[in-house]
Amino acid sequence: MTVQDYMLTLGKQARAASRQMASADTGKKNAALLAIADAINSARDTIAAENARDMEAGRANGLDAALLDRLELTPERIDGMIEGLNQVAALPDPCGEITDLKYRPSGIQLGKKRTPLGVVGIIYESRPNVTVDAASLCLKSGNAAILRGGSEAIHSNKAVAVCIAAGLKAAGLPETAVQVVETTDRAAVGELITMTKYVDVVVPRGGKSLIERISADARVSVIKHLDGICHVYVDKTANLDKAFNIVINSKTHRYGVCNAMETMLVDEAIAADFLPRAAKEFAARGVELRGCEKTVALLTASDIPVVAALEEDWDTEYLAPILSIKLVANMDEAIEHINNHGSHHTDALVSENYTLARKFLTEVDSSSVMINASTRFADGFEYGLGAEIGISTDKIHARGPVGLEGLTSQKWIVFGDGHIRN
């Protein structure tokens, strides 16, 4: 069978399964999630053995330490997969919710009903636990899913797929509601993102090159974010103790995540009081500082290591212990910098001025805008969404962390009693 024929088969099966999933009741969906959790728990040894095969192949193929870390399924990570399934089962089911019900002057009753998207294709790299995260969210939201993991995790993903199929079968749902692509041929991705008849939306999770390629080539809708160039602006009215804790947490809590601060903006009026203190702490934690001309002058005078920032630094997602710092004259300059150089992901203001906070919320064009809080809160779990399928920086129905509701849409529903239009 050719890759094209194989993917076509998956697409047809997913479309058929999606129709059954759309009408599946909450009890059945939750039963499937709990049965998958039980199956994974029972298959721990098999999953670990298959993951060990992937790890061995990864080392032989020269995968770097970061990729190997994401690939590994430790006992704790398997526990996390099981816990994630239990958490999603406990979340409210968004499907079927009817809102905005009202009568029109014509006498008809009009409302909106939340419905699944249909078939969701998810393309991701390295992390086999994403297979479970993606499957659980798609199932609970009434969708069918086609999951294409990285070739480096093929054995792990196949082992997890067996558990997912067993859980679906035990709950009386179609086993084809979640299908893992079992070929490592890259042509499978090209087929998946162009099957407009069978796939409704694609969610890429991975490096920038993967997401750019899918965005350029896809013929189905894409939910994505390319970069997490997140800013924290410390305004002149800020409580400096609050600001210190927020910027340190935003940058150093975890470096390799999309909601970590990459650029810190500081009002010139408080720079002398605030910047050396914060910079000294960053330096003590091993963070390389790259500053504008004024930043370099101020920190050099305080004997704090700093290098001159290049223009491209303002447009870089480091995912590393590196921080760009720029002094600005006022909030207008800060907002202009964020909107010109940011990635519409997450940006924060530290300020005690209510009027300025309102201005920041209104004018910063990002999927999450925060006042006096760390950018690290931009996360599906922290937002009460449970697991997330990803974070969208596009201006579509799903913006910011995409949980269950982001995998649904709304259709108009109309009730009449023989009404006709005059």
UniProtKB/Swiss-Prot annotation:
Q: Which InterPro entries match?
A: Ald_DH/histidinol_DH (IPR016161), Ald_DH_C (IPR016163), Ald_DH_N (IPR016162), Aldehyde_DH_dom (IPR015590), Glu-5-SA_DH (IPR012134), GPR_dom (IPR000965)
Q: What is its main location?
A: cytoplasm
| Any one of the GO BP annotations | L-proline biosynthetic process
Catalysed reaction(s) here are:
L-glutamate 5-semialdehyde + phosphate + NADP(+) = L-glutamyl 5-phosphate + NADPH + H(+)
Pfam families, alphabetically?
Answer: Aldedh (PF00171)
* Its job: Catalyzes the NADPH-dependent reduction of L-glutamate 5-phosphate into L-glutamate 5-semialdehyde and phosphate. The product spontaneously undergoes cyclization to form 1-pyrroline-5-carboxylate.
EC number per UniProt: 1.2.1.41
Q: Which organism is it from?
A: Saccharophagus degradans (strain 2-40 / ATCC 43961 / DSM 17024)
Q: Which GO terms describe its cellular component?
A: cytoplasm
Per UniProt, which keywords does this protein have? Amino-acid biosynthesis, Cytoplasm, NADP, Oxidoreductase, Proline biosynthesis
**Into which family does the record put it?**
Belongs to the gamma-glutamyl phosphate reductase family.
**Protein name in the entry:** Gamma-glutamyl phosphate reductase
Kindly list the places in or outside the cell where this protein is found, as annotated in its UniProt entry.
Answer: Cytoplasm
Please give the superkingdom of this protein's source: Bacteria
Pathway of this protein? Amino-acid biosynthesis; L-proline biosynthesis; L-glutamate 5-semialdehyde from L-glutamate: step 2/2
Give the molecular function GO annotations: glutamate-5-semialdehyde dehydrogenase activity; NADP binding
